[in-house]
Amino acid sequence: MITWPAPQVPSIPGALTSVRVMDTSSGQLVETVRPGVGESSMYVCGITPYDATHIGHAATYIAFDLLYRAWLDAGQRVVYTSNVTDVDDPLLERATATGVDWTELATSQITLFFDDMSALGVLPPHTYLSAVESVPMVISATRHLLESGRAYRVPVPAQERPVHSPAYDIYADVTSDPDFGSISGYTSEERVRLFTDRGGDPATPGKKNPIDPIMWKAQREGEPGWDGDDLGWGRPGWHIECTTIAHCGIGRSCTVQGGGSDLIFPHHEMSSAHARALFGQDAGASVHAHAGLIAYQGEKMSKSKGNLVFVSRLRQEGVDPMAIRLAILANHYRDEWEWTSDVLDAGIKRHQLWLQAMSTNGGPHPGATLAAMREALSNDLDAPRALDAVDAWAYATLAGNDEDPGAPGVVSRAVNALLGIRL
């Protein structure tokens, strides 16, 4: 799938030498720029396109865009892969409820997502595949796990109206992975609760374990399906979709797997277990990094609650996308925080401050500002401290310190390259 256009990343003096990121599984800051290794790779889980991009989505993709930019500044070759789950239960349910063909709904929302990402200055993935495009890979992976005894069939009862008979859903057996649970560290009770709350089916008759994830869902009446040969007609499960797409774009292992903190379990736990089952116990990500969830009107922003703030709507109202990005960057990517009008107003004011300072004929020498930005970003992508460094430079500039006539240009390029803020 072709992504949105890549924004230009300008060259700036100096370079990062270290980029440490918090690893969820260990609870430690982990170095992601390895000595003698000129490449860093990242898989970030994509959207299910049944609604427009909200601020929570934007915050996650901006967080990992910071990591991408930090790696580039460190001289790394970056390999970035992502997905879009363009066939899944929530999408099909929304299409049915609105009377829109599911493919048209997915296409329209993917287009809007691309427009939002482009406007926000997010660097696109090199490999961007959809669930539909992953079908042949998922069939192969599911067959492999069946043959190795790590997956099993569960008959679909007639009351669920399977299109073909006999029909089987295929599940992965989580107990076949000795390292299952190593990412989240949750108890058995917590796993079942989260699996249930986040769309799982713990009570399905015939499952070996309540939290076994579906790999291949047999086609039901009114739903799309693909010919899986010996697997029967069906469609991919979410977790195996990401596993196969990550392997296609990056290989058996990557530097970072990223997403929102609501993906720690079951999604990242399951997709990592699939990777180990398919490619060996040392397969998967070296670091699992997670962005905090954003609240609105007192509750976590979610499609099910409907308490969403859409990027496209803010843009339609005339808000500069760079002000939106600045409002998001004012909070550390791992923090949970609430979107309010005051948060947006602060982003707008900061954007205006920076524009005013960058339009002057000189400013303080930029060396200390760039060093402070890099020091902040090297320590778990601390964007708020990087913003503070630019604020200090801007206030000094507007106070009349114009010692270096080239400073505004250098700082402008730096906030573009490191923070993704085009001025």
Swiss-Prot record:
Reaction catalysis annotation: 1D-myo-inositol 2-amino-2-deoxy-alpha-D-glucopyranoside + L-cysteine + ATP = 1D-myo-inositol 2-(L-cysteinylamino)-2-deoxy-alpha-D-glucopyranoside + AMP + diphosphate + H(+)
Q: Motif 'KMSKS' region: which residue numbers?
A: 300-304
One GO biological-process annotation of the entry reads:
mycothiol biosynthetic process
Protein name, please? L-cysteine:1D-myo-inositol 2-amino-2-deoxy-alpha-D-glucopyranoside ligase
Which GO molecular function entries does the Swiss-Prot or TrEMBL record give?
ATP binding; cysteine-glucosaminylinositol ligase activity; cysteine-tRNA ligase activity; zinc ion binding
Q: What does this protein do?
A: Catalyzes the ATP-dependent condensation of GlcN-Ins and L-cysteine to form L-Cys-GlcN-Ins.
Originating gene: mshC
Q: Does the keyword Nucleotide-binding apply?
A: yes
Q: How is the cofactor bound?
A: Binds 1 zinc ion per subunit.
What is its quaternary makeup? Monomer.
Pfam families recorded: tRNA-synt_1e (PF01406)
- Asked if the keyword Metal-binding belongs to this entry, the reply reads yes
Gene Ontology cellular component annotations, sorted alphabetically = cytosol
Which cofactors, by name? Answer: Zn(2+)
**InterPro entries linked:** Cys-tRNA/MSH_ligase (IPR024909), Mycothiol_ligase_MshC (IPR017812), Rossmann-like_a/b/a_fold (IPR014729), tRNA-synt_1_cat_dom (IPR032678)
Q: Which residues bind Zn(2+)?
A: 45, 242, 267
Question: In which residues is L-cysteinyl-5'-AMP bound?
Answer: 45-48, 60, 83-85, 238, 260-262, 294
Motif 'HIGH' region: which residue numbers? 47-57
**Coordinates of motif 'ERGGDP' region in the sequence?**
197-202
